[in-house]
Amino acid sequence: TQPLPPACIEAMHKAVEELAGKDTFRGYGPEQGYDFLIEAIIKNDFAPRGIHFSASEIFVSDGAKSDTGNIGDILRHDNSVGVTDPIYPVYIDSNVMCGRAGVLEEETGKWSNVTYMPCTSENNFIPEIPDKRIDIVYLCYPNNPTGTTLTKPELKKWVDYALANDTLILFDAAYEAYIQDENVPHSIYEIK
């Protein structure tokens, strides 16, 4: 861990000063995110990769953990789930809490309605495409906790699987800022 860089400290000082004045205090932001932030995300994160979104398609939230849980509220409770293994625990926990994970199998510690896709040194920590239809697949790349990334052709296999099977991919790109290889997509929207 390193100390905060000067640019961050300067920005935080500026924000504190804004919050200290009656005329510049903002309180809670808009539920979808500030317009200036949404425009900056479109301009700096997606447009350089040739991905075009309108402001109404960008949602700024408080993070993947709550989004992962909340999106499950609009999905059917009997949907099957696929996760890479190992996995960010919230992907499983949120499905357990809403009843989608099925029954816990005591012998294995795994849930009956979850397909676990092993990521091991034998497969270079890249899961095999399932040989059955799964309703919802969670993918996190760069992966937490393995650090593995997928190339565009590897991610395209998942997109093709999803299109062929009417599968929803919940793609968590929380660590995309660490990607330096131009053959590794920062977003699933880079896949044609």
Describe the function of each predicted region:
Residues 1-27, 124, 133, 167:
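N-terminal "arm"/small-domain region of PLP-dependent enzymes with the aminotransferase-like
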Residues 21-161, 176-192:
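Conserved core of the PLP fold type I
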Residues 170:
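Generic enzyme active-site microenvironment
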Residues 173:
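Walker B catalytic acidic pair
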